[in-house]
């Protein structure tokens, strides 16, 4: 009876102490990642309700990135969580992103390509702000900042070339980086660009 009671007490203490220790020492455990990727997570719920196209895109990316992570022996929990949250910045002005344009109206048709690039790049900054507001781990924050690397937005570059005389610098139509610093973020960048 003593052994059973002691074991039960140990399990209860573990469930109470692990979250506190995770936050105290800034650790990201599989328990924390599982909690974050739950459909009960408030940020996941917001994505589902406010930007459903982005939510579906994130789920698809998560499935591919998780499979890639498993294939090369990387942390599948972290890979899935990174994919779930990489585009949370799209919660600000979700209609600027094609996956959320359900009524056929694209606001980018009415504005200059340079403004479109500026607006689209801001989802990175907004994503970092939300990650900090919701207390997401640093690993997920880096996935947000790195998932586009310095890829160009060629659609807007070519659109600008059609209406602009002279040379244009492709860097002005590209994401600001940084490039991925982990295998998971690199896989996320590739899968996100191809999905």
Model-derived features: positions:
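Non-catalytic interface/linker regions that flank or bridge core catalytic/transmembrane domains
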Residues: 1-45
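Divalent metal-dependent catalytic cores for phosphoryl transfer on phosphate-bearing substrates
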Residues: 44-195
